[in-house]
């Protein structure tokens, strides 16, 4: 993900790995992986693509977290929008 700084407009790149590292550096008790938040009304093709991307990001985040667990927990967000089958699959992954 690329953001722009509110201070000077500089581009800031945030990967699943750098997101976890930043939360660890801040001493977060609970780390949340990056995910894509979609609007409520979205077509199935876009929903499935977002679902797959988010789960790839979660795996990368978990790998980074497990390299240096410390006393921090990681929680994943359940995805799938209003598609109950995708939400169930998200819980099982």
Predicted features along the sequence, with ranges:
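Glycine-rich phosphate/ribose-binding loops and adjacent secondary-structure elements
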Residues: 52-55, 61-93
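Non-catalytic, usually N-terminal nucleic-acid engagement modules in DNA/RNA processing proteins
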Residues: 1-69
């Amino acid at each position: 993900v690329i953001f722009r700084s509110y201070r000077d407009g500089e581009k800031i790149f945030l990967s699943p790995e750098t997101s976890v590292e930043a939360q660890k550096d801040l001493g977060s008790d609970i780390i949340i992986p990056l995910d894509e938040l979609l609007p409520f009304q979205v077509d199935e093709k876009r929903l499935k693509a977002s679902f797959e991307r988010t789960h790839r990001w979660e795996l990368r985040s978990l790998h980074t977290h497990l390299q240096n667990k410390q006393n921090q927990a990681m929680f994943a967000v359940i995805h799938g929008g209003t598609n109950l089958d995708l939400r169930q699959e998200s819980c099982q992954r």
